[in-house]
C-alpha cells in the first residue's frame, strides 16, 4: 500500500519539544491529567493530534496532505506544582486549521473532541494565545469602551446598573415601573435578568415598550442618558434579530444577549448588527460555571472571555471578587485586563499563560454583579477602576424605602468613593469611613448602610 498501516504512538508525530512557535500560531495551554500509566508526553501529543489532524490509526489519505504544515504540535510539557499527575501541555496550532472570523470553528477544533478522550482522566483548557493575524479577522465588540463613554457622555467613574428582580413573574407594566424608579434615582442602566426572554407572564414586545417608556421618562427628568439591557436572547436566531431590530426602532441605546446559551454563531451575528445600527451589546455569561468551575476539567473563564471579545460584546459579567459568587482576586483581575487592554503580558501569577496582543480590537467593560451592596463600593472601585459596570440587583431593590432611594444610595456611595480616590485617599483602608461620611448627608445611603451592615457571603 505504500504506507505503514497500524496504530502508532501519538508522541512519535505530535510531540515536538524542539518546535519554535510561529507568530501566526494559535497557542493553547491545557491542564492534562493522564490516566495512570499514560506518560505525559503521550497525553499531550494525543490532545494535539485529536484537536488538529490526527486520528487513532494511520490512514492512507495522510499521504495526500502535508502533515507538517497542518498538524497541531505539543511543544512543551511541565508538571503543575503541588498537584499529583497534573501537567500543563502547550500546543501550537497552525493558523490555516481555522476559519477566519469564526469563534464557533475555533472552539469546535480546539475543544470539540478531545475532552472525552480515554487516555485522559481530565482535561482543562487554561488559556489561548490568539495571534494578531487571526484577531484581525474578527469585528470584535460592536463599540468598545471609549465609544460607549462618548455615547453615554459619562466619564471618570464606573457605570452603575441594577438587575430587575424578582426576575420572573412581574407584568410588563410593573417591570417598567421598577426600571423607571431605578433610573430616576441615579443608576445608568437597568437590566433584564438573563432568563427573562418572552414568557407567558411577560411577552418580550410588551416589556420592550414599557422599558423604553421608563428610560425616556427617566432621561427627561435627570438630564442623563439612561439605558436598559433589553434581552434579545431567543429560541431562534431569526427571533433574536427581530427583537434587536425592534429595540433599535424604539431608539434605545443597548440590548443584551446570553452568549453561551445563545451560542457563538448567534452572538457574532448580533454583534455585527449592533455595530451596524449603533446599539451597545451587553453580554451575560449564563452557563459559564458548567464549563469553567471544575479546576481540572473544562475551560477557564479567561478563554470564554477572550472568545467573547472576538465574537463581540460591549459588557460582560466577570465576577465580583467580593460578592456571593466565587472568583479569586488576582485571577479575576487577569481576565479583566484581557477584556479591557490592548496588550497583556504573560503573567502566571494572574493565570495569564501567554502574552496577548489584541492589536486594535475594541475593549469590553467588565461587569461586577452578584450579591454586592453599598459596603462593597470602595473595594469595587479600587479593584475594577473606572472602566467597569457595577451592578446591584438586590443591593438596589432591597432598599427599605424602595427602588429610587436604593439607586440614590448606590450613586452617592459611588460618587463618594470616586471623589475620595481622586483626592488620594486609600479606599482599601479608609473605605468604610468614606461610606460613613457620605451617609451623614444622604439619608438614603444611611438607611442602606444600616440594612446591609452585617451581610457577608463567606463560606
Swiss-Prot record:
<dbReference type="GO" id="GO:0016984">
    <property type="term" value="F:ribulose-bisphosphate carboxylase activity"/>
</dbReference>
<keyword id="KW-0934">Plastid</keyword>
<feature type="site" description="Transition state stabilizer">
    <location>
        <position position="324"/>
    </location>
</feature>
<dbReference type="GO" id="GO:0004497">
    <property type="term" value="F:monooxygenase activity"/>
</dbReference>
<dbReference type="GO" id="GO:0009853">
    <property type="term" value="P:photorespiration"/>
</dbReference>
<feature type="binding site">
    <location>
        <position position="193"/>
    </location>
    <ligand>
        <name>Mg(2+)</name>
    </ligand>
</feature>
<keyword id="KW-0503">Monooxygenase</keyword>
<comment type="subunit">
    <text>Heterohexadecamer of 8 large chains and 8 small chains; disulfide-linked. The disulfide link is formed within the large subunit homodimers.</text>
</comment>
<dbReference type="InterPro" id="IPR033966">
    <property type="entry name" value="RuBisCO"/>
</dbReference>
<dbReference type="GO" id="GO:0019253">
    <property type="term" value="P:reductive pentose-phosphate cycle"/>
</dbReference>
<feature type="binding site">
    <location>
        <position position="317"/>
    </location>
    <ligand>
        <name>substrate</name>
    </ligand>
</feature>
<feature type="binding site" description="in homodimeric partner">
    <location>
        <position position="113"/>
    </location>
    <ligand>
        <name>substrate</name>
    </ligand>
</feature>
<keyword id="KW-1015">Disulfide bond</keyword>
<feature type="binding site">
    <location>
        <position position="285"/>
    </location>
    <ligand>
        <name>substrate</name>
    </ligand>
</feature>
<keyword id="KW-0601">Photorespiration</keyword>
<dbReference type="GO" id="GO:0009507">
    <property type="term" value="C:chloroplast"/>
</dbReference>
<keyword id="KW-0150">Chloroplast</keyword>
<dbReference type="InterPro" id="IPR020878">
    <property type="entry name" value="RuBisCo_large_chain_AS"/>
</dbReference>
<keyword id="KW-0460">Magnesium</keyword>
<feature type="modified residue" description="N6,N6,N6-trimethyllysine">
    <location>
        <position position="4"/>
    </location>
</feature>
<dbReference type="Pfam" id="PF02788">
    <property type="entry name" value="RuBisCO_large_N"/>
</dbReference>
<dbReference type="Pfam" id="PF00016">
    <property type="entry name" value="RuBisCO_large"/>
</dbReference>
<keyword id="KW-0488">Methylation</keyword>
<feature type="binding site" description="via carbamate group">
    <location>
        <position position="191"/>
    </location>
    <ligand>
        <name>Mg(2+)</name>
    </ligand>
</feature>
<feature type="active site" description="Proton acceptor">
    <location>
        <position position="165"/>
    </location>
</feature>
<dbReference type="GO" id="GO:0000287">
    <property type="term" value="F:magnesium ion binding"/>
</dbReference>
<keyword id="KW-0479">Metal-binding</keyword>
<feature type="binding site">
    <location>
        <position position="167"/>
    </location>
    <ligand>
        <name>substrate</name>
    </ligand>
</feature>
<feature type="active site" description="Proton acceptor">
    <location>
        <position position="284"/>
    </location>
</feature>
<feature type="binding site">
    <location>
        <position position="194"/>
    </location>
    <ligand>
        <name>Mg(2+)</name>
    </ligand>
</feature>
<dbReference type="InterPro" id="IPR036422">
    <property type="entry name" value="RuBisCO_lsu_N_sf"/>
</dbReference>
<dbReference type="InterPro" id="IPR000685">
    <property type="entry name" value="RuBisCO_lsu_C"/>
</dbReference>
<keyword id="KW-0602">Photosynthesis</keyword>
<keyword id="KW-0560">Oxidoreductase</keyword>
<keyword id="KW-0120">Carbon dioxide fixation</keyword>
<feature type="modified residue" description="N6-carboxylysine">
    <location>
        <position position="191"/>
    </location>
</feature>
<feature type="binding site">
    <location>
        <position position="369"/>
    </location>
    <ligand>
        <name>substrate</name>
    </ligand>
</feature>
<feature type="binding site">
    <location>
        <position position="163"/>
    </location>
    <ligand>
        <name>substrate</name>
    </ligand>
</feature>
<comment type="function">
    <text>RuBisCO catalyzes two reactions: the carboxylation of D-ribulose 1,5-bisphosphate, the primary event in carbon dioxide fixation, as well as the oxidative fragmentation of the pentose substrate in the photorespiration process. Both reactions occur simultaneously and in competition at the same active site.</text>
</comment>
<keyword id="KW-0456">Lyase</keyword>
<dbReference type="InterPro" id="IPR020888">
    <property type="entry name" value="RuBisCO_lsuI"/>
</dbReference>
<comment type="similarity">
    <text>Belongs to the RuBisCO large chain family. Type I subfamily.</text>
</comment>
Amino acid at each position: 500500500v505504500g504506507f505503514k498501516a497500524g496504530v502508532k504512538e501519538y508522541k512519535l508525530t505530535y510531540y515536538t519539544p524542539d518546535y519554535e512557535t510561529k507568530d501566526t500560531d494559535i497557542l493553547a495551554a491545557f491542564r492534562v491529567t493522564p490516566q495512570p500509566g499514560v506518560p505525559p508526553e503521550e497525553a499531550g501529543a494525543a490532545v494535539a493530534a485529536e484537536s488538529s489532524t490526527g486520528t487513532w490509526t494511520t490512514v492512507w489519505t495522510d499521504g495526500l496532505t502535508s502533515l507538517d504544515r497542518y498538524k497541531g504540535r505539543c511543544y512543551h510539557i511541565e508538571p503543575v506544582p503541588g498537584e499529583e499527575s497534573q501537567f500543563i501541555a502547550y500546543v501550537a496550532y497552525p493558523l490555516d486549521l481555522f476559519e477566519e472570523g469564526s469563534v464557533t470553528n475555533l472552539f469546535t477544533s480546539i475543544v470539540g473532541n478531545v475532552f472525552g478522550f480515554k487516555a485522559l482522566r481530565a482535561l482543562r483548557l487554561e488559556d489561548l494565545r490568539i495571534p494578531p493575524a487571526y484577531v484581525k479577522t474578527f469585528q470584535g465588540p460592536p463599540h468598545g469602551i471609549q465609544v460607549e463613554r462618548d455615547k453615554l457622555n459619562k466619564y471618570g467613574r464606573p457605570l452603575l446598573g441594577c438587575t430587575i428582580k424578582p426576575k420572573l413573574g412581574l407584568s410588563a407594566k410593573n417591570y417598567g415601573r421598577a426600571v423607571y424608579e431605578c433610573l430616576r434615582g441615579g443608576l445608568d442602566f437597568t437590566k433584564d435578568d438573563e432568563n427573562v426572554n418572552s414568557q407567558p407572564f411577560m411577552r418580550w414586545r410588551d416589556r420592550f415598550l414599557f422599558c423604553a417608556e421608563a428610560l425616556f421618562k427617566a432621561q427627561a427628568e435627570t438630564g442623563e442618558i439612561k439605558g436598559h439591557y433589553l434581552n434579545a436572547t431567543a429560541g431562534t436566531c431569526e427571533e433574536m434579530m427581530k427583537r434587536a431590530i425592534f429595540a433599535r426602532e424604539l431608539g434605545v441605546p443597548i440590548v443584551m444577549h446570553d452568549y453561551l446559551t445563545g451560542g457563538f454563531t448567534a452572538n457574532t451575528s448580533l454583534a455585527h448588527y449592533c455595530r451596524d445600527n449603533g446599539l451597545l451589546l451587553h453580554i451575560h455569561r449564563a452557563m459559564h460555571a458548567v464549563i469553567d468551575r471544575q479546576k481540572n476539567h473544562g475551560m477557564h473563564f479567561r478563554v470564554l472571555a477572550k472568545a467573547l471579545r472576538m465574537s463581540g460584546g460591549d459588557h460582560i459579567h466577570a465576577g465580583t471578587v467580593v460578592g456571593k459568587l466565587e472568583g479569586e482576586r488576582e485571577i479575576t483581575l487577569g481576565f479583566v485586563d484581557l477584556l479591557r487592554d490592548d496588550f497583556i503580558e504573560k503573567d502566571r501569577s494572574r493565570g495569564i499563560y501567554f502574552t496577548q496582543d489584541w492589536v486594535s480590537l475594541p475593549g469590553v467593560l467588565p461587569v461586577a454583579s452578584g450579591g454586592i451592596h453599598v459596603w462593597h463600593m470602595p473595594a469595587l472601585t479600587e479593584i475594577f477602576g473606572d472602566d467597569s459596570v457595577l451592578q446591584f440587583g438586590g443591593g438596589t431593590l432591597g432598599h427599605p424605602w424602595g427602588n429610587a432611594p436604593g439607586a440614590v444610595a448606590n450613586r452617592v456611595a459611588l460618587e463618594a468613593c470616586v471623589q475620595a480616590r481622586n483626592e488620594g485617599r486609600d479606599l482599601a483602608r479608609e473605605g468604610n469611613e468614606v461610606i460613613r461620611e457620605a451617609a451623614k448627608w444622604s439619608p438614603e445611603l444611611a438607611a442602606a448602610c444600616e440594612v446591609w451592615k452585617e451581610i457577608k457571603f463567606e463560606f
